Curated annotation (Swiss-Prot):
GO biological process: 2-hydroxybenzoyl-CoA catabolic process; 4-hydroxycoumarin biosynthetic process; coumarin biosynthetic process; polyketide biosynthetic process
TM region(s), chain numbering: none
Conditions for induction: Not regulated by elicitor.
Subunit structure, as described in the record: Homodimer.
Temperature dependence: Optimum temperature is 35 degrees Celsius.
Protein name in the entry: 4-hydroxycoumarin synthase 1
Function: Type III polyketide synthase involved preferentially in the biosynthesis of 4-hydroxycoumarin from salicoyl-CoA. Can also use benzoyl-CoA and malonyl-CoA to produce 3,5-dihydroxybiphenyl as a major product and benzoyldiacetic acid lactone as a minor side product. Can also use m-hydroxybenzoyl-CoA as substrate, producing m-hydroxybenzoyl diacetic acid lactone as a derailment product. No activity with p-hydroxybenzoyl-CoA, CoA-linked cinnamic acids or acetyl-CoA.
Family indicated by similarity: Belongs to the thiolase-like superfamily. Chalcone/stilbene synthases family.
Species this chain originates from: Sorbus aucuparia
Enzyme Commission designation: 2.3.1.208
Entry annotated with the keyword Acyltransferase: yes
Record SUPFAM superfamilies: Thiolase-like
CDD domains in UniProt: CHS_like (cd00831)
Active site: 161
């Protein structure tokens, strides 16, 4: 006998049920990093480049970062720090096992917070731009965690920094359209593939060396959380992706024998600032058709660099402190790519509890995740916070 309408559960928006983060053990303080970089790449005699790099580091507003690479690894593999040297095989041999392991560390933290048996995970989304192999990092994570071999897997390669919001969109679709689904989302980046020695002909490398960092995030997403068992953190209400016109040269990365050869245009902050009001307005039209007071929202903005964060703040007319969680992650972790926006949400909900706020979103009801990456692609996710009951 089919259940009556009364017995059927009213479908809900997908919710983030847990967040976990992880970093490699090696901490690099920004004040010491120039000495390290110029020493290991054997460029201590390049005082001109050193002065430029010192200025970039001083303006980065990054205090420390975590990296897989060590001086010992670099000394044993000089092809990694010799600009242009064929080194892709060496890099991938390192990263193909290490990226899933870092993702596993974040996933175990999220699963522990979630508090449910791992057998309840029905879907897995794995996102990385650091390694490419078949079978992929998603397959390796299934083995590392002991997930059901029939878990539904989705692998996202080479999307870049906007993908932290992309995976929330996919997880929302899976959770809301598959009854009882519990989606484990993992983003893991180890930027060894982007590490290069220094050269006069490609100064973009100096910017990457000052900002890029390693980290992994995991979130568990599901609709209709079980009362008294699952504790939602944020509701994923609506998502939207768009390409900023005429900006594809802004962030470019090409896989070459030397690793990822990347290009970072100084126009990126201008592109983001010139379009942020438009794409946020259109994103919130999907929610209630009304423009929001931007200062009434909480924000998780991809920390691609201080100028990008400043432009978002300026163009939206945000009050001081509105991007506190974003700036904290930029300062304490650097730009970790896709995981960054999840680190920001984790920092925000923890700080909200610590400060006695009413909700996980700094005491506010509505908020937005803004992912920014190659394309330039902007991916947004409208979130609704949950009341803090503990």
């Amino acid at each position: 006998m089919a259940p009556s309408v009364k017995d059927q559960v009213e479908p809900q928006h997908a919710k983030i049920l847990a967040i976990g983060t992880a970093n490699p053990p090696n901490v690099y303080y920004q004040e010491d990093y120039p000495d390290f970089l110029f020493r290991v790449t054997k460029n201590e005699h390049r005082t001109d480049l050193r002065e430029k790099f010192d200025r970039i580091c001083e303006k980065s507003r990054t205090r420390k970062r975590y990296l897989y690479l060590t001086e010992e690894i670099l000394k044993a593999n000089p092809c990694i720090y010799t600009y242009g040297a064929p080194s892709l095989d060496v890099r991938q041999d390192m990263l193909n096992p290490e990226v899933p392991k870092l993702g596993q560390e974040a996933a175990l933290k999220a699963i522990k917070e979630w508090g449910q048996p791992i057998s309840k995970i029905t879907h897995l989304i794995f996102c990385t731009a650091s390694c490419v192999d078949m079978p992929g990092a998603d397959f390796q994570l299934v083995k590392l965690l002991g997930l059901n071999p029939s878990v539904t897997r989705t692998m996202i390669y080479e999307a870049g920094c906007y993908a932290g919001a992309t995976v929330l969109r996919l997880a929302k679709d899976f959770a809301e359209n598959n009854e009882g689904a519990r989606v484990l989302v993992v983003c893991a980046e180890i930027t060894t593939v982007f590490f290069h020695g220094l050269t006069d002909t490609h100064l973009d490398i100096l910017v990457g060396q000052a900002l890029f960092a390693d980290g992994a995030s995991a979130v568990i997403v599901g609709a209709n959380p079980e009362p008294e068992i699952e504790s939602p953190l944020f509701e994923i209400v609506a998502c939207r992706q768009t390409i900023i016109p005429n900006s594809e040269h802004g962030v470019v990365a090409n896989i070459r024998e030397m690793g990822f050869n990347y290009y970072l245009s100084g126009e990126v902050p201008k592109f983001v600032g010139g379009n942020v009001v438009d794409f946020l307005t259109k994103t919130f039209e999907k929610v209630d058709g009304k423009n929001k007071d931007w200062n009434s929202l909480f924000f998780s903005v991809h920390p691609g660099g201080p100028a990008i964060v400043d432009q978002v703040e300026e163009q939206l007319g945000l009050k001081e402190g509105k991007l506190r969680a974003t700036r904290h992650v930029l300062s304490e972790y650097g730009n970790m790519g896709a995981p960054s926006v999840h680190f920001i949400l984790d920092e925000m909900r923890k700080k909200s509890i610590e400060e006695g706020k009413a909700t996980t979103g700094e005491g506010l009801e509505w908020g937005v995740v803004i992912g920014i990456g190659p394309g330039l692609t902007v991916e947004t996710a409208v979130l609704r916070s949950e009341f803090i009951t503990c």
